[in-house]
């Protein structure tokens, strides 16, 4: 039976009242907001290194077209660079929960994996501390176990040695069907299994904080400057001057946030922005 031809997409033009607002936006980094008529809460929050260009490009999918039909006004907030835009967007989406954005919520609990006395453990990592290397940032213990099971399948690791299921002196069922290399029944030494496990976990390693104190990541766009203060991967806040950044408050260890870590890890490790050590 021949396939039905796909109907042509209906033409859609950028609403005139929104186009005028978009064209008036700056060609600068920052965060922008779409609002429906009469609403004080945004429909959608986005970010870009060029607010105007990104606003005018919001016609790429049917979902974006539908959102533009609902929107009545656009607002924006400039930042001094991409890092500031990413941090601001992440914070505002968590706080405001816009209808058209993927839901982001601050995680009150995070889990990671670590090796302790030759055993793999799942621990709470809402607060990062000095100690053994941590692997992965998971939103629940269940998600950590699911990820570990996929890793076990890929590398023929033993569920019992990973702590996923009880040990069996005769070896696990997965060893019988050759999904486990057999460390549970003597086909492989425990040391060899641990070495393979650590190699498999390496790409999940949580980077250690590389500075002796808090730092500020400095960004500038035109006359605008911002200093993003970070301490042990915890985002403290954004300030307009280095002097203000040096007066930034400290935060409790429980303020660690996985989304901020993912935003900050590259600029901190590779210094894509100027780093000021706040000792």
Where are these regions (language model features)?
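Conserved catalytic/ligand-binding micro-motifs in nucleotide and anionic cofactor chemistry
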Residues: 1-43, 47-279
């Amino acid at each position: 039976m021949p396939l039905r031809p796909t109907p042509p997409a209906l033409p859609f033009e950028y609403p005139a009242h929104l186009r005028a607002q978009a064209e008036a936006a700056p060609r600068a980094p920052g965060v922008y907001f779409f609002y429906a008529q009469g609403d004080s809460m945004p429909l959608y929050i986005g970010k870009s290194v060029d607010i105007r260009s990104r606003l005018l490009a919001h016609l790429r999918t049917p979902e974006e077209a539908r959102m533009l039909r609902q929107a009545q006004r656009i607002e924006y907030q400039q930042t001094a660079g991409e890092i500031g835009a990413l941090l601001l967007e992440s914070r505002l989406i968590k706080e405001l929960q816009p209808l058209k954005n993927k839901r982001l919520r601050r995680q009150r609990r995070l889990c990671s994996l670590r090796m302790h006395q030759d055993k793999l453990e799942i621990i709470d990592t809402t607060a990062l501390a000095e100690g053994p290397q941590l692997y992965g940032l998971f939103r629940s213990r269940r998600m950590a176990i699911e990820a570990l099971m996929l890793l076990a399948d890929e590398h023929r690791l033993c569920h019992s040695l990973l702590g996923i299921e009880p040990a069996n002196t005769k070896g696990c069922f997965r060893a019988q069907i050759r999904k486990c290399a057999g460390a549970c029944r003597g086909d492989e030494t425990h040391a060899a299994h641990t070495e393979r496990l650590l190699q498999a976990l390496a790409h999940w390693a949580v980077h250690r904080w590389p500075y002796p104190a808090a730092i500020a990541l400095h960004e500038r766009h035109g006359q605008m400057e911002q200093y993003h203060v970070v301490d042990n991967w915890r985002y403290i806040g954004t300030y307009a001057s280095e002097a203000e950044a040096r007066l930034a408050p400290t935060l409790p260890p429980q303020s660690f946030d996985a989304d901020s870590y993912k935003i900050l890890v590259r600029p901190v490790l590779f210094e894509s922005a100027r780093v000021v050590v706040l000792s």
